[in-house]
Amino acid sequence: MSFLDHIKQRRTIYAVGKNVALTPEQIESVIKEAVNHSPSAFNSQTSRIVTLFGESHLQFWNIVRETLRKIVPEAAFEGTNAKINSFAAGYGTVLFYEDQDVVKALQEQFALYADNFPVWSEHSSAIAQFAVWTASVSYTHL
């Protein structure tokens, strides 16, 4: 399958489940490879990931649920809770974030471009997320 075919096959999976053909270690390997080989401005590689499986995955979604329970109106919480339950039903969670220490260091090192690094960092994150999403097409229910 070509890269463009992978892009065309990429879809949001709403019915998340635990039927996954890969081990957590294999999933982490695919994700790390995709992120590590994603281009970034000045080869800054600011994108970071956290993968959660098993109990830590469930704990994360319980934290999200209880946090949102405090701010979402009670009348709307049922729908919010259903969405959280659908995410918690998955095999794991991948969290993306940007290493702000690296961004700040680049801003100091290349002062002329300082205002651009936060934006470029977000671009890097988008590219990394796209790479992971597209790589997942090669695997069943990643």
Report residues per predicted region.
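Short pre-catalytic strand/loop immediately N-terminal to key active-site residues, enriched for Gly-Thr
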Residues: 115-124
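Short, flexible, mixed-charge acidic loops at enzyme active sites
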Residues: 64, 106-111
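Short glycine-enriched loops at secondary-structure junctions
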Residues: 98-102
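Conserved coil-to-alpha-helix start sites within the AMP-binding
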Residues: 123-131
